Amino acid sequence: MIGRGLLAVALGLLALAPIKARAAEKFTTIYSARVMAQALPWIAEDAGLFKKYNLDHSLVFIASSSIVTAALLGGDPDMTMTGGVGNVIAFVRGSTDIAYVGSAKNLMTQNIIAGGNLKRPEDLKGKRIAVSRIGSNSHYFTIQALRRHNMEPNRDYTFLQSGGDPESLTALLAGGVEVACLTPPTDVQALSRGYHYVIYGPDLKIPYAATSFVTKRSTIARRPQAMAQYMRAMGEASKIMHSDREVVYKVLGKQLRIDDRSILDAAYNAEIKVMEPRLALKAEAFQAILDEVAQTDDRAKKVKPQELTDPRFLNDMEKSGFWDQIWGKR
């Protein structure tokens, strides 16, 4: 009887053992852009946060938000970090398993950059503008920004799909295009080469779920604990991003091969102003995308922003005191 009693106690203690004592759970994130706004997984890896939260994490880069959405629906990743209208279009068309669980950025910070005598938006008529992909953040921003100057795609300008921000910069520097839509820190690299802003995006304050954490409701149901641990890792990475620029510079320097501190300073100072410290989901950011999709698909008019999101992990991080613990009450 004593032996059985000791065994029962031992099993009970094992059940109460901290999560770190258990085997790490495999977890895959796909991200779509090599930019500061999508640097949280890089920061988490550098800081050992995935290990802290008992995740055996794999990070995969695919330079297309539409392909990332297809991969998500195909069942490959546990989480995606992406922007663009792809996820919303898929939801509107019936893929309602998609769920946004957090956002790193809810405003657009792209910029339209050119050289020579191209100074005003009107000067871009007839030009080809480099964007990463059709349907990407840079594509959407260019349309929205130039629409404010009564300019429309195909009628007044066309696009070159480069594949990503670094590739758009390469096309600009090589003379393949005269205009490019770029995001920090790539825009600052162009400025250092003598190019200039035609439109400075942050001034426009265009609401948009530009960088979000997107998964599937079925994955949440199957792996709620792993999802909760992942979001806490991202929460801590966000704290590092906002409070320790030296770590951010180290990570960006490694990932983007940038060692010019003036470029990193300019990029960080511009981007950090619009990053969400607590990964907030904002209705207006999703409504902006729904409004755009509704121009070609009436079904988007019936979708409410709240239907796209699942804030359970953010709510738990708030109620449990997680945010207050890492930020300090303020």
Task: Describe each model-derived feature in a short phrase.
Residues D291-R330:
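Conserved C-terminal helix/tail region of periplasmic/extracytoplasmic solute-binding proteins
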